[in-house]
Amino acid sequence: MKYYSSFGFHDFVICCGYKGHVIKEYFADYYLHRSDVTFDFSAENRMTVHQNVAEPWRVTLVDTGLNTQTGGRVKRVQKYIGDERFMLTYGDGVSDIDLSALLAQHEASGKTVTLTGIQPGGRFGVLDLDESGGTVTGFREKAKEDGGWINGGFMVMEPEIFQYLTDDTCILERTPLESLAIESKLGIYKHNGFWQCMDTQRDRSKLEMLWGSGHAPWMRETV
C-alpha cells in the first residue's frame, strides 16, 4: 500500500479472507501501531499519542469469504469499485515496477486488462505473446525455465472485467484472463527490474534481509 501510495494512489479496497478480522483490527488501531503512546492510569485514565501518524489513504476492508477463489473475490468488491478503472495486485509480491508507466501503457493500449510480465525462475507457468510482444495470447502452466514471461500481478483493469467474473468459484487467472487473451484484450507490461513473491520460508528470509538492510528495491517515499 505504501508503494502504491508513493505513486499517488491512495484509495484501497482489500479483499479479506482468512483472519480478515485481524486485518480490520490492525487498521482500526493503525495510529497506535505506528506511534509512541502514553497510557495514564491515574484518575484521569488518559491516553496520549505522541505522533499523529497519518496516511493519505481511504481503506475499505471487505469480507470476501474463506474459500472464495481470486475471481470471486474481485467480483464481491465490485460495488465498491463501480464503473472506474482500477489496479489489482496480490498481497504476496513486491517489486520496483513503475506504476505510472504501467498505467500509461494500459491507457494507450485499449486493452481490458494489462498485467505485469516478469521473468523469474522456472516454477511458474508462462505467458504466450503475439508477434508484437504486447498482447497475451495464452498461458502455459509449469513450463521449464526458458526465459518466458509470467504474470507478476500488478494489473490494471477496466470495469468490463466484471462481465467475465461469475461466482465464488471463479479463478481470475483461468477462464477470465484466458478468455481475454483469446479476444486479444489482455495486454502485458514487461518489467525487467526487481520482483519477488513470498511463497516459502526462504522467500520470506530473503525479503526480510533486504528490508532490514534499509535498501529494499520497493522502498519509496510516499507522495
Regions found by a protein language model. Give the residues of each.
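Residues at the starts of beta-strands that form the adenosine-phosphate
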Residues: H10-F12, T112-V113, K185
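Extracellular glycan-interaction surfaces
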Residues: T116
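Short acidic-glycine loop/turn motifs at beta-strand connectors
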Residues: L129-T135
